[in-house]
């Protein structure tokens, strides 16, 4: 029995394709899917911060796990090359007003 060959994949950006910078991501989960909501944190004053959400992406649980695996590997590669990524201990997941 022969192993099927991989198809030649051609990546094409649709006219709606956009790139943007996000320094905020919210994750919402249901039994059917994961929703990643990307945004930018915009300080308004010393006591007010606004999060401007600009894109929501739904993923199946399987695709969310595949993304997790890919991100894990790429973070490991990044830290091997550039050093450990330090997180602000005050901003651990689940500590803010949006989880």
Question: Language-model features: where?
Answer:
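N-terminal intrinsically disordered, cationic/polar leader segments
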Residues: 1-62, 69-99
């Amino acid at each position: 029995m022969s192993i099927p060959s991989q198809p030649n994949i051609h990546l094409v950006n649709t006219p709606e394709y956009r790139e943007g910078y996000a320094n905020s991501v919210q994750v919402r989960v249901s039994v059917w899917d994961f929703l990643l909501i990307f945004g930018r944190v915009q300080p308004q004053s010393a006591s007010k911060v606004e999060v401007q959400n600009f894109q929501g992406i739904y993923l199946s649980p399987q695709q969310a796990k595949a993304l997790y695996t890919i991100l894990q590997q790429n973070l490991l590669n990044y830290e091997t090359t550039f050093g450990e990524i330090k997180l602000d201990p005050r901003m651990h997941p689940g500590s803010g007003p949006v989880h």
